Amino acid sequence: MNYIDLKDKSEAELLAMLKEKKLELFTLNAKQKTMQLTNTSELRVAKKDIARIQTALTAARAK
């Protein structure tokens, strides 16, 4: 997911995506704690996606 893909989306779409990504991060953290997560780089990717979405939200609200 790139910032370019996100900057054209509406605020409602971004909020929905943010909620979905936070839920995904929660499940990944739970899997890591129970030693079920094999690819730990998914955590980093999810965190960066959340940061990108929050940046796009801030830019959308500033307009």
UniProtKB/Swiss-Prot annotation:
Keywords: Ribonucleoprotein, Ribosomal protein
Matching SUPFAM superfamilies: Ribosomal protein L29 (L29p)
Classification via Pfam families: Ribosomal_L29 (PF00831)
CDD domains for this protein: Ribosomal_L29_HIP
GO terms (BP aspect): translation
GO cellular component, one term: ribonucleoprotein complex
Claim: Ribosomal protein is one of the keywords in the record: yes
MF terms (GO), sorted A to Z: structural constituent of ribosome
Family classification: Belongs to the universal ribosomal protein uL29 family.
Cited NCBIfam families: L29
UniProt protein name: Large ribosomal subunit protein uL29
Organism in which the protein naturally occurs: Sulfurovum sp. (strain NBC37-1)
Gene encoding the protein: rpmC
